[in-house]
């Protein structure tokens, strides 16, 4: 279903392009050695117009292949390959690099990635607190170390270009990217972002200050209104000249620190889209001394003014953008640049300057001396080292802001029995927030290398001298309740909201239930808020809490929280922005708590010995929903999928590709992550994929549901009950997308001689309509067989059902 959603939105799936094209013969892979002794300008003089235009575009990894790189020699590739460890990342990047060296130009490429709080697309890397927490910590030295560690772990993945830091000034917490900002204080933003950038650069990485500029100053209600309407993200910043100059000082500090690239903002400034704002883009180069290159943001060229895509590409290049992050339309953009130069709509001097800047950055990064990074040096040999985790742990400790501590409930004293409750206590995805293993959020709550708050308390309870209780039935035995509430994980406009309350659309589903249950216990309550911004706190709830700690999005090291709450370190974090008491206060001088507020344990506090950090287990294996059943794994051979247990035999169309096992697990995790109630979570946790086959316009999913786990209290749970629940769940998956979901009805259908109950849906968007058929058949007391078929076009369900024999 995760891929189904992607197909519906984009009408394109991850397809191996090489399967559609003849193999490209490699050229001389050693030309980079000659280039190494030439200036960027001399190298540019050797290139054809076509080769120069290729350096100016940046495809997404899932839209290109090694053969495409070998044929065209693109300047860069970006985005994620999924849940991938450092070793696999190296293979991926090295494959593209070898192909780039064998391309007609022979220019090394550079891989770009949004490593915004550590190398967050790498499994078992260190995930630091997001920037809002770094702003609360306000520790220049540790932020510099964070940059160094991020660079070192990125190099272990051979990802040499980091789209970070975000240097936005966040002024409205309704903005979904608030947590990516260091706060609202420009001096703190300038100090910390510069320290971080220096850390990246000093360890050999290419940094990228973003998003130029005023992306955090946009006015609520002016959000971009494209295929997905946004409330505030990518909106319009209405600023005076003096306000603009203050924001530019942050970028001047980045340039002075040596930042090599700058990314343009999706947003507008006083009504002008930044991607076409030549005045300010060229100001970077002509007045502020920027010698690196300018990159556009994801697909943003399409959203500027212009009668055609051609006009928009030409306008953005002429405005001063050197590399176009046109992830899907990169080939079209490349050809437009070529034709525009020939037609004198873009000067060749403009192209030469852009490519020289791109090559300079690559040369300075050492890619012309050692493109395969064979001689690259790193401090660590693997990601996620204990040494690096300790630095992240320190930042977590310093980022915590104590809002309230009535009766000195904190720190927990030795002998205290602590009952831990609330969804934020034991969910790695919530704790790490967006941009973790995936763009919007990690699709699983159990993330390798992440120690949750609850796990930290349990792991070090003996060291702290406390007893941890997690069973609600035993809660009455506790002396104090540790209530962990917060927000769902989100990224960009998905976090835009007009309701900042803990029980609003982006609050965790059980926040209210957990708060009510904690109150009923009649014990002192310590509340930890795990969120990417200052949410609006209900006044009555706040009064009932004895202590309140703002944790922001702490990342992988939950021990930083348990250490401080158990008295191994004091609170030192301060609010990096005002904390508003209501929506009406936003943008005014009124607030609940002022910027810079933060309590400590006070005079006389003596820190206890901190327990030695223990690395998280390499994996967190959970019971599989097939355990205890007679399930057998299906087989796929010679284009035919067979599962003897369900009795299904299906001829899979040749254009469909079988998904790897890792993707099947990811799809299941994705569904579980989207559950907002206990019934959905039980059902999706009881569901597992046997096989999945996809092509660009549709596919087949074969699943099983353990009905005893899905509905343990309902022995009569059948196909109709499943489809009723699952159909409602499917509709919810598309909420917020520009898609209309229509239920077409339920009937019976035969798959391979077996009768199934079939539900049919259509999903309609700007590009057309997709049909989804969901088939269910109960096999025995334990398992139900579920088949999903989805497609675009005029075919009928019966056309696909004929493939089953």
PLM regions with names:
Residues 664-775, 784:
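Conserved polar/disulfide-associated segments of primarily extracytoplasmic proteins
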Residues 779:
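Extended hydrophobic
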Residues 1-4, 8-9:
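Positively charged n-region of N-terminal signal peptides that target proteins for export
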Residues 20-621, 626:
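Glycoside hydrolase catalytic-domain context in secreted enzymes
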Residues 75-79, 260-266, 773-774, 782-792:
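Short, well-ordered beta-strand elements
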Residues 9, 13, 17, 402-405:
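Hydrophobic core
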Residues 618-683, 736-743, 767-769, 788-805:
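N-terminal targeting sequences that direct proteins away from the cytosol to non-cytosolic compartments
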Residues 83, 115, 531, 654-656, ...:
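A mature extracytoplasmic/lumenal domain signature
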């Amino acid at each position: 279903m995760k891929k189904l959603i992607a197909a519906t939105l984009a009408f394109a799936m991850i397809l191996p392009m090489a399967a559609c094209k003849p193999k490209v013969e490699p050229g001389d892979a050693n030309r980079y050695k000659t280039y190494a002794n030439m200036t960027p300008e001399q190298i540019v003089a050797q290139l054809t117009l076509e080769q120069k235009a290729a350096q100016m575009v940046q495809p997404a990894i899932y839209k290109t292949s090694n053969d495409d790189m070998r044929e065209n020699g693109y300047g860069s590739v970006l985005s994620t390959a999924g849940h991938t460890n450092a070793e696999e990342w190296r293979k991926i990047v090295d494959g593209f690099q070898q192909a780039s060296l064998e391309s007609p130009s022979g220019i090394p490429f550079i891989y770009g990635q949004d490593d915004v709080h550590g190398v967050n697309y790498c499994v078992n890397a260190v995930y630091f607190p997001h920037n809002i927490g770094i702003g609360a910590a306000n520790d220049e030295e540790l932020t510099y170390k964070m940059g160094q560690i991020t660079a070192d772990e990125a190099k272990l993945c051979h990802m040499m270009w980091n789209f970070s830091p975000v240097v936005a000034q966040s002024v409205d917490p309704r903005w979904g990217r608030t947590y990516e900002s260091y706060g609202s204080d420009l001096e703190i933003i300038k100090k910390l972002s510069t320290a971080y950038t220096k850390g990246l650069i000093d360890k050999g990485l290419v940094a990228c200050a973003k998003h130029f500029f005023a992306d955090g100053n946009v006015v609520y209600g002016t959000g971009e209104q494209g295929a997905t309407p946004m409330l505030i993200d990518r909106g319009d910043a209405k600023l005076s000249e003096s306000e603009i100059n203050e924001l530019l000082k942050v970028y001047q500090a980045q340039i002075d620190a040596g930042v090599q690239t700058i990314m343009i903002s999706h947003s507008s400034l006083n009504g002008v889209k930044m991607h076409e704002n030549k005045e300010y883009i060229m100001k970077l180069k002509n007045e502020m001394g920027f010698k690196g290159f300018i990159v556009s943001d994801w697909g943003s060229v399409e959203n500027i003014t212009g009668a055609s895509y051609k006009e928009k590409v030409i306008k953005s290049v002429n405005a001063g953008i050197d590399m176009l992050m046109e992830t899907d339309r990169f080939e079209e953009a490349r050809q437009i640049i070529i034709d525009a130069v020939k037609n004198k709509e873009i000067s060749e001097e403009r192209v030469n300057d852009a490519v020289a800047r791109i090559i300079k950055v690559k040369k300075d990064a050492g890619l012309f001396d050692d493109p395969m990074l064979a001689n690259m040096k790193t401090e660590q040999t693997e990601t996620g080292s204990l040494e690096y985790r300790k630095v992240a742990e320190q930042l977590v400790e310093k980022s915590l802001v104590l809002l309230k501590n009535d009766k000195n409930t904190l720190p927990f004293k030795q002998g205290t029995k602590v009952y831990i409750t609330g969804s934020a206590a034991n969910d790695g995805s919530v704790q790490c927030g967006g941009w973790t293993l995936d763009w919007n959020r990690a699709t699983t709550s159990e993330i390798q290398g992440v120690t949750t708050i609850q796990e930290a308390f349990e792991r070090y309870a003996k060291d702290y001298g406390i007893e941890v209780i997690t069973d609600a039935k035993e809660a009455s035995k506790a002396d104090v309740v540790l209530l962990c509430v917060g927000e769902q994980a989100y990224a960009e406009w998905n976090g835009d909201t007009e309701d900042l309350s803990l029980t609003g659309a982006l609050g965790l589903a059980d926040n209210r239930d957990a708060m009510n249950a904690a109150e009923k216990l009649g014990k002192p309550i310590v509340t930890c808020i795990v969120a990417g911004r200052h949410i609006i706190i209900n006044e009555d709830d706040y009064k009932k809490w004895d202590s309140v700690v703002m944790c922001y999005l702490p990342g992988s090291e939950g021990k930083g929280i348990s250490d401080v709450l158990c008295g191994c370190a004091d609170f030192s974090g301060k609010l990096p922005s005002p904390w508003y008491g209501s929506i009406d206060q936003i943008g005014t001088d009124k607030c609940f708590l002022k910027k810079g507020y933060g309590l400590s344990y006070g005079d006389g506090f003596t820190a206890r010995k901190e327990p030695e950090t223990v690395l998280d287990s390499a994996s967190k294996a959970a019971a599989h929903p097939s355990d205890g059943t007679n399930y057998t794994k299906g087989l796929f051979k010679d284009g035919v999928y067979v599962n003897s247990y369900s009795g299904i035999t299906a001829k899979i169309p040749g254009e469909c590709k079988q998904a790897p096992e890792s993707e099947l697990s990811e799809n299941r995790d994705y569904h579980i992550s989207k559950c907002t109630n206990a019934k959905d979570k039980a059902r999706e946790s009881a569901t597992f994929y046997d096989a999945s086959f996809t092509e660009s316009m549709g596919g087949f999913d074969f699943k099983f549901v353990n009905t005893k786990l899905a509905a343990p209290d309902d022995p009569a749970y059948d196909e109709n009950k499943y489809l009723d629940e699952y159909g409602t769940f499917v509709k919810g998956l598309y909420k917020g997308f520009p898609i209309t979901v229509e239920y077409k009805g339920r009937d019976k259908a035969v798959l391979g001689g077996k009768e199934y109950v079939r539900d049919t849906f259509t999903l309609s968007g700007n590009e057309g309509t997709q049909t989804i058929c969901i088939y269910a058949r109960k096999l025995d007391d334990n398992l139900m067989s579920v088949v999903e078929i989805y497609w675009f076009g005029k075919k009928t369900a019966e056309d696909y059902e004929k493939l089953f024999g």
